[in-house]
Amino acid sequence: MKIHEYQAKELLRKYGVVTPRGFHTVSVDGAVKAAEELGGKIWVVKAQIHAGGRGKGGGVKLARSLDEVRQHASDILGMQLVTHQTGPEGQKVRNLLIEEGADIQKEYYVAALTDRATQKVAIMASSEGGMDIEEVAHSTPEKILKEFVDPLVGLTDAQAENLARGIGVPEASVAKAVDALKRLYTCYMETDASLAEINPLILEGNGNIKALDAKFNFDSNALYRHPEIVDFRDFDEEDADEIEASKFDLAYISLDGNIGCLVNGAGLAMATMDTIKLFGAEPANFLDVGGGATTEKVTEAFKIMLKNPKVKGILVNIFGGIMKCDTIATGVVAAAKEVNLSVPLVVRMKGTNEDLGKKILAESGLPIIAADTMAEAATKIVAAVK
């Protein structure tokens, strides 16, 4: 689960990380009122969407007067903000963060994330703050430093100091940078985050260290322990079909292709998508019905896939272990009839009650294309949609 920048900073402040003063608003008048309350001579008007690259897309503007605050807020609020992370369709801006200006002397990058290779927490830091960290990793990987933290020990002062000095924090501000890093780590651990990123972490002229921007992702499997974080969820920022799928315990992610995929098991689902690509087409979605699929779940899965106008065909790939093939077959037939399926449908099923499942499909009276292997299934659906 993702949250907005203003919510991420609220979390950081709770853990003692210093951030600029700012106010969240959803209106132009609210933006002006926020600037008046903040005082000063310079403000930042920031679009709040669940994507990076907002500045390059025109979603972050400096204002040197209240009139400019009003103008920028009016321009940004309601705009369809396109960044390298949103895709060409962009995301509508419904929220703003109005912040006081900052005396930026230097920008750094810091983040905490799980490193599966070492089974530890990786604390990353770079002197190249304010940039897309993927670009830094590609062009100058030597500028990214890492410390691997044993969760049973925690981030030590020595590790934090190594990072702070390694990215060039002035000696007079090292202690403050160490404090920020340790607080970020604590926040990451205690909230069950999968990513806690500050980009940039800035050095001000007075030597203070502040989090100028922040991004958090949370492990959805741990949200039951954090109702206060669940309250941050903004459904307007999420894909409507993914929200609908979650109501039926379907793992669904929309993609850009034209072949809908209905599979049981995440690994098989990814292998199915890979096979479709191997045979020259693109999957329209990832959809895992899980091991307890019912006729209702399969029907809803079909409805969700077919909401996408790009879907020109559907591939069902089932391995009957916990999930019995006849159950899936019954669901597929019922779903196809209920939605008046008009696109090609290829079904490949193996495992428990396989023969019964194939019999149900064959006797359904529907133009279902059967396949025995993944390669055959992919070949047939790719040919059918061309």
Curated annotation (Swiss-Prot):
Binding site for substrate: 264, 321-323
The reaction(s) this protein catalyses: succinate + ATP + CoA = succinyl-CoA + ADP + phosphate; GTP + succinate + CoA = succinyl-CoA + GDP + phosphate
Lineage summary: Bacteria, Pseudomonadati, Pseudomonadota, Betaproteobacteria, Rhodocyclales
Homology family: Belongs to the succinate/malate CoA ligase beta subunit family.
UniProt cross-references to PANTHER family, sorted A to Z: SUCCINATE--COA LIGASE [GDP-FORMING] SUBUNIT BETA, MITOCHONDRIAL, SUCCINYL-COA SYNTHETASE BETA CHAIN
Needed cofactors: Mg(2+)
Binding residue positions for ATP: 46, 53-55, 99, 102, 107
Pathway noted in the entry: Carbohydrate metabolism; tricarboxylic acid cycle; succinate from succinyl-CoA (ligase route): step 1/1
Name of this protein: Succinate--CoA ligase [ADP-forming] subunit beta
GO molecular function terms listed in the Swiss-Prot or TrEMBL record: ATP binding; magnesium ion binding; succinate-CoA ligase (ADP-forming) activity; succinate-CoA ligase (GDP-forming) activity
Assigned GO CC terms: cytosol; succinate-CoA ligase complex
